[in-house]
């Protein structure tokens, strides 16, 4: 019944299996991918006819993780998979980026690729399997997919690269790198690194590239045995059409590209297609050419002019050389009520960034196939339409915003302090207020500035830069700090972020084949020099974290208690912890290991809650002195409450040095007294004394000998009074805003 084709290869110590002909046989291309206990179904379907009047290739990639793949039932009311998670969006983009450039340029048929995780093994990288499966499915479909792509994931521990790092290994790995490409070219790189050098990053890319070559070969074998036919494609446009457009409009295009202002240049460029279409109106009517052919030929002419200026004249749109960085302006502390804020401007790209601290209760809860976990650091990238002067409504975050935000997250995350060092959750919001190339790298720079201003003890400032490439045959030029048009017409978008000591994130998308490792080496070195220049400008404003935090930031402290005391702090049905929170106004979070985190809007509320927790969790020692309250008077003595929830008995003989006739003659209910713990009776009840305690009253409520060390938070600043707007603290140089002296 089934005509199944199966191909296997030993890869990185595991067996990779690709099969077709059994599942989803009606799809144009369908491949089942297996490695370990992971199983994915990848399908590709192409529309029979081209989509008219569209100026781009309508490729849609959908990666889905089914809950049953990990033996789970989805959460939520409906108990079924819904909107794509951020993880699914990111993997969808990861699949799209190396595949999209490899279709025939004239192909505009709608194409849908779906990769579904059917069985999930945490020991295998399902995102890599999805890229491989998508490539294999497309190779079996009629779509003119010109090259076969494969991918690999690389880790680094103790100076050794290795394939297929598991989630546990990634916790200690210095590198999490995905590289995808063909037999002869790298097409895509995505990575997070812990301050690695350019040489190490290039070596990692080479290691990953070499490792997936056997996978490319078995996909080719699978496609060859399946013998699926491909759509025959014609040239995107006739050569004579391009020549005529070049002859008539090249001069005007050249003059337009000489305009340095993006807005003015874009406005003038938008007028040219109207003129071109008007010129060819008769040819369109006679169906000699269609609109798409004319617009494509025009884009090719524009590309030739821009690229020719760079390669032949060393002349970029805005007059810079290939290594020049646009003018940089940095400001911090713009938003008085934010915990930290910064405005980073590079040329016509600008990012307004704020940082906010929260409690551990504010951490993002993520439900994944691996299980539920919390994310302490959140970075939200926002790209509003006004940033590029588009008259459009604001929408929910799209795939691009999720992807750019994650790239900036990867760049900043390696320099953040541990939770022990800084027990806050952190949210960074970066709104792109202007955009003309590399807004994600502006987000990285602005985030670093905002975090340092807020007082987050990051290990080092972080900056990012986007590199470009123009290549014709053997001649090429690597561009630093690319503009939007240089990205659009160029051959590579290469983003590198890091500190002065090394790289923290790298993302590379290549649109052409033939970019070798020598070009990558040059690009990495040029990016390093550009990154150091940007860091130098940022350091003129703020070079290290402030010692003071905003007065609006929550006060916090943490302490470690015995695990046996957790139930006492919580109380039956949460009664005790709820009472502490209500009476103190604080928030309390308790971890399973006995770490108690307390947060409050001010230090007074924090102290009230801390004292109550200590009273429950910390056992007093004999000889310690406490403040107590007389609760009940008896003939033989008095009951005194101390440490909030503990009671002890003071015998009449322990009330005063001299003999007294009655307890009531010295003490009254409600009196505040000093008491010393002198022992316990045979029932474990505390025995207290007042007469000896008065001599040691200076040591009342001492810190117990075994009391845990508490986190000491930085001092807080007054955001309003010390950050008032005036001309002095906004004086600018030609490059950067001078450092603001907000703190005494």
From Swiss-Prot:
Any one Pfam family match given in the protein's UniProt record, by short name: RNase_PH_C
Keyword Magnesium: yes
InterPro entries in the cross-refs: ExoRNase_PH_dom1, ExoRNase_PH_dom2, ExoRNase_PH_dom2_sf, KH_dom, KH_dom_type_1, KH_dom_type_1_sf, NA-bd_OB-fold, PNPase
EC number: 2.7.7.8
UniProt-annotated binding residues for Mg(2+): 487, 493
UniProt keywords, alphabetically: Cytoplasm, Magnesium, Metal-binding, Nucleotidyltransferase, RNA-binding, Transferase
Stretch list, region Disordered: 691-744
Compartment list: Cytoplasm
Domain S1 motif: 623-691
Cofactors demanded by this protein: Mg(2+)
GO biological process, one term: RNA processing
Membrane spanning residue stretches: none
Domain KH: from-to ranges: 554-613
Biased composition (Basic and acidic residues): 707-718
Keyword Metal-binding attributed: yes
Role of this protein: Involved in mRNA degradation. Catalyzes the phosphorolysis of single-stranded polyribonucleotides processively in the 3'- to 5'-direction.
Protein name as it appears in the record: Polyribonucleotide nucleotidyltransferase
Gene label: pnp
């Amino acid at each position: 019944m089934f005509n199944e084709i199966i191909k296997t290869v030993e890869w990185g110590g595991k067996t990779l299996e690709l099969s077709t002909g059994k599942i989803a046989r009606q799809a144009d291309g369908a491949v089942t991918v297996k490695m370990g206990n992971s199983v994915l179904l990848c399908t590709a379907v192409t529309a029979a006819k081209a989509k008219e009047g569209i100026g781009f290739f309508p490729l849609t990639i959908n990666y889905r993780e089914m809950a049953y793949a990990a033996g789970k039932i989805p959460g939520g009311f409906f108990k079924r998979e819904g909107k794509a998670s951020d993880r699914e969006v990111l993997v969808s983009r990861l699949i799209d980026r190396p595949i999209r450039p490899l279709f025939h340029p004239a192909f505009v048929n709608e194409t849908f690729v779906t990769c579904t995780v059917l069985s999930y093994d945490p020991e295998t990288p399902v995102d890599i399997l999805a890229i491989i499966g998508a490539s294999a499915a497309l190779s079996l479909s009629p779509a003119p997919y010109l090259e076969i792509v494969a991918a690999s994931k690389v880790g680094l521990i103790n100076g050794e690269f290795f394939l297929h790092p598991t989630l546990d290994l990634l916790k200690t790995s210095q590198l999490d790198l995905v590289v995808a490409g063909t037999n002869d070219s790298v097409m895509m790189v995505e990575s997070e690194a812990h301050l690695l050098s350019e040489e190490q990053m290039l070596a990692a890319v080479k290691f990953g590239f070499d490792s997936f070559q056997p996978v490319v070969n078995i996909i080719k074998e699978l496609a060859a045995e399946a013998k699926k036919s491909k759509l025959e494609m014609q040239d995107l446009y006739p050569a004579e059409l391009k020549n005529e457009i070049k002859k008539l409009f090249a001069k005007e295009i050249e003059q337009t590209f000489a305009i340095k202002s993006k807005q003015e240049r874009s406005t003038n460029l938008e007028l040219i297609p109207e003129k071109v279409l008007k010129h060819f109106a008769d040819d369109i009517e006679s169906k000699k050419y269609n609109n798409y052919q004319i617009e494509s030929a025009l884009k090719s002419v524009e590309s030739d002019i821009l690229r020719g200026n760079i390669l032949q004249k060393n002349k970029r749109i805005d007059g810079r050389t290939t290594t020049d960085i646009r003018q940089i302006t940095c400001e911090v502390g713009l938003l008085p009520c934010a915990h930290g804020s910064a405005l980073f401007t590079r040329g016509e790209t600008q990012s307004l960034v704020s940082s906010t601290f929260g409690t551990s209760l504010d951490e993002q809860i993520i439900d994944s196939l691996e299980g539920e976990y919390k994310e302490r650091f959140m970075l939200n990238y926002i790209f509003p339409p006004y940033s590029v002067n588009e008259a459009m409504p604001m929408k929910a975050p799209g795939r691009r915003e999720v992807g750019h935000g994650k790239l900036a997250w990867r760049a900043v995350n390696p320099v953040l302090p541990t939770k022990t060092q800084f027990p806050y959750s952190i949210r960074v919001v970066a709104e792109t207020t202007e955009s003309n190339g590399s807004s994600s790298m502006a987000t990285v720079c602005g985030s670093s500035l905002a975090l340092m201003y807020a007082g987050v003890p990051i290990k080092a400032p972080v900056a990012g830069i986007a590199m470009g490439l123009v290549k014709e045959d053997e001649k090429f030029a690597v561009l630093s700090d690319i503009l939007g048009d240089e990205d659009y017409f160029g051959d590579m978008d290469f983003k590198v972020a890091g500190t002065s000591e090394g790289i923290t994130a790298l993302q590379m998308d290549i649109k052409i084949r033939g970019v070798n490792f020598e070009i990558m080496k040059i690009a990495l070195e040029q990016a390093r020099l550009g990154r150091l220049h940007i860091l130098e400008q940022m350091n003129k404003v703020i070079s290290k974290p402030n010692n003071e935090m905003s007065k609006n930031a929550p006060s916090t402290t943490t302490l470690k208690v015995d695990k046996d005391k957790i139930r006492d702090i919580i109380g039956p049905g949460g009664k005790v912890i709820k009472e502490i929170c209500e009476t103190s106004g604080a928030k309390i979070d308790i971890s399973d290991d006995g770490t108690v985190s307390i947060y409050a809007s001010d230090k007074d509320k924090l102290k009230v809650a801390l004292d109550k927790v200590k009273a429950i969790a910390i056992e007093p020692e004999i000889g310690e002195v406490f403040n107590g309250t007389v609760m009940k008077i008896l003939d033989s003595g008095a009951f005194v409450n101390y440490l909030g929830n503990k009671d002890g008995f003071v015998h009449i003989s322990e009330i005063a040095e001299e003999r007294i006739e009655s307890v009531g003659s010295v003490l009254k209910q409600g009196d505040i007294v000093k008491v010393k713990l002198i022992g316990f009776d045979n029932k474990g009840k505390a025995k207290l004394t007042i007469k000896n305690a008065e001599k040691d009253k200076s040591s009342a409520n001492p810190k117990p000998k075994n009391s845990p060390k508490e986190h000491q938070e930085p001092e807080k600043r007054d955001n309003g009074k010390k950050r008032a707007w005036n001309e002095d603290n906004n004086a600018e140089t030609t490059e950067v805003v001078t450092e603001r002296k907000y703190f005494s």
